Amino acid sequence: MCVKKIVPSEQRDYHKGRLTHGSSITMEGELVGIIGGTGLGDALAQRLTDAKLHDVDTPFGKPSAPIMVGAIGQKRIAFLNRHGKGHKLAPSEVPFAANIFAMKKLGVHTVIGSGAVGSLREEIVPGELVVVDQFIDKTFRRISTFFTGFAVVHCEMAEPVCSRVSQVLIDAAKEIDVMTHPDGTYVCMEGPQFSSRAESLMHRGWGGDLIGMTAMPEAKLAREAQICYALIALVSDYDCWRPHHAKKVKQSLLQEIMANLQAATNNCLKLIETVLAGEAELVSEDCPCRKSLELAVWTDKSQISAADKKKLAVLFE
């Protein structure tokens, strides 16, 4: 990846966006994006050196929160809190397009996402991790493409995550004492309500292994941005296909779920630290993900205005 110098001032434009907060920085070498929740972000912040927050303007509005850029060891990372400060954004309100566009604008070519899920399988136990390899998208209120209104773009999604980065995560998990499932199908629902029992049983019948609300359209937009994307699912509980113990009160169930989520977050942090400390290649310009738009634009290029081409030029880098 080439070195990009970004001057964060209100006067200096960078691909029609502005960065603010902090002094000038140079994005040296590889910058790995991480998208996750507040717990993971707080833990990473304690380990980052030379950390700065960056506000990034995009054609799709502001991302969920300022992006925290810094270093862990020899790796530079850019962390984005998906739900915003204080977990204020419901899944349907997350500005997924702005989040992915902002990451790409900063020079991120690889993103590792993380997020809480419910388990649809007895063998996937709360507190464990899953490196997701497939999705079933049930969302219906979210913008799932950057190209609305001026171009038709059909990206391949048969293999919806980067197998190369996913394998790096799987290999790293073998080095540490963290139970990590090497594959799993994630059913992404709109929310914010949880499933009915009938829906949960249906999702199991479809072949789903996990149920969550945040992976889509994040993975689709990452593919449109030509970003290598992998996802670590943090299992917080069993979904309602599996009845809870009749004598358990709601408060104790919630405490149990939060404890499971904290355990999974700690495991995810350990896995990410292992990956960042390793020598495996996280960013590769030769990866097929980096060429996902090569044959995807079906609209006659002459019919796309210069302004629209300039607006989304970042996606083609």
Roles of regions detected by a PLM:
Residues I25-A158:
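Metabolite-binding pocket within alpha/beta catalytic cores that recognizes anionic/polar moieties
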Residues K104-G107, R204, R223:
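Non-catalytic positions within long, well-ordered alpha-helices that form the structural scaffold/packing
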Residues I176-D209, W298:
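Active-site/ligand-binding-proximal alpha/beta "capping" segment
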Residues W241-L293:
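His/Asp/Glu-rich mid-to-C-terminal helical/loop segments that flank catalytic regions of hydrolases
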Residues S284-E317:
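A short, charged, Gly/Pro-tolerant segment at domain boundaries
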